[in-house]
Design a protein with these regions (language model features):
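Active-site-adjacent structural elements that line small-molecule/cofactor binding pockets in enzymes
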Residues: 1-306
Length: 306
């Protein structure tokens, strides 16, 4: 199993130095990947329900909390690391025009030496779409078109597109990603998201779900993959979970407790088919996050990677 960690790019302790130290330590500890989440503007009042808590309340809602841009964060981290992969958990496709998004990602992939992972989702906060001046209707259909556009921009010499929501004439789009394309990890748990993952993704990137729920989602993704004429065996399964040694996380299914309890729980996810685990570490300082990352790397990772 491979392990990734969420970068400390939001919260009261955001800083250039803290971000650099955390990312470089993750790189040195041989974590597979580091990840950034995508929010741009936080309305003071939100009626939209957050899909990953039982109450629908968003644990991170604080309009004045410092938050660095996801792609800008990854570009910075690309410049101060050498090996670790760089992903979004997840990039909300509807927040940006697709050609602009593709340019940002091809840039990240080139300057990082081919380390980008494009984790995508359709978003849930209607109010943020409104603040950004972007439509929030038909989010799934728009996302499907965006993924088609990315494929063309990354592969074709003079790509063009004419869809229901997006269109552009033949254009030049260079440089291409280092390996010709960027892996797409599809987030979400709705039936449409699972269908999208199976038909257009390289991985399902689930979040805060139990092994039992994940098993059902994974079966659906593999079914859609086969129906689309793709190889389900080539798909990857990733799940994002809290890592909370203090036992204070508000997120469901967070990993907590001592080493043996964590190993047993992670083994349940592995039995479902999980090949990648993204750790969302709970803490109140960068030093604390690094200590917990080091502890996990020392106590848990060796038992699951050898």
């Amino acid at each position: 199993m491979q392990f990734g960690v969420h970068l400390p790019h939001f919260g009261p302790f955001v800083s250039r130095e803290g971000l650099r130290r955390f990312a470089q330590r993750a790189d040195a500890l041989d974590f597979h990947s580091v990840w950034a989440s995508d929010h741009i503007a936080w309305p003071q009042h939100i009626d939209s329900l957050y899909p990953y808590t039982t109450t629908g309340e968003w644990p991170a809602h604080d309009p004045w909390m410092p938050r660095l841009d996801a792609i800008g964060t990854l570009l910075f981290v690309a410049g101060c690391t050498e090996r670790v992969r760089l992903g979004t958990t997840v990039l909300v496709l509807g927040y940006r025009p697709p050609v602009q998004t593709a340019k940002l990602w091809s840039t990240l992939d080139v300057v990082s030496g081919g380390r980008a992972i494009l984790g995508v989702g359709v978003g849930w906060m209607r109010e943020e779409f409104e603040v950004l001046g972007m439509p929030s209707d038909h989010r799934g259909a728009r996302a499907d078109e965006q993924l088609e556009i990315f494929e063309r921009l990354f592969a074709e010499h003079a790509p063009a597109y004419a869809g229901r929501f997006y269109r552009f004439p033949p254009i030049g789009f260079e440089p291409k990603p280092v390996r010709g394309r960027i892996p797409v990890w599809v987030g979400g748990h709705a039936p449409a998201a699972l269908r999208r993952a199976g038909r257009a993704g390289d991985a399902l990137h689930a979040a805060h779900v139990s092994p039992e729920t994940l098993a059902g989602q994974w079966a659906e993704v593999r079914r859609h993959c086969a129906e689309a004429g793709r190889d389900p065996g080539a798909m990857e399964l990733s799940v994002r979970l809290g890592l909370d040694y203090a036992g204070t996380s508000a997120r469901p299914n967070a990993l907590s407790g001592e080493r043996e309890a964590m190993l047993a729980r992670i083994t349940e996810y592995a039995a479902v088919g999980t090949s990648h685990l993204l750790l969302d570490i709970t803490g109140d300082s960068v030093d604390g996050l690094i200590r917990d990352m080091e502890r996990f790397a020392d106590e848990v990772v060796p038992a699951l990677t050898h």
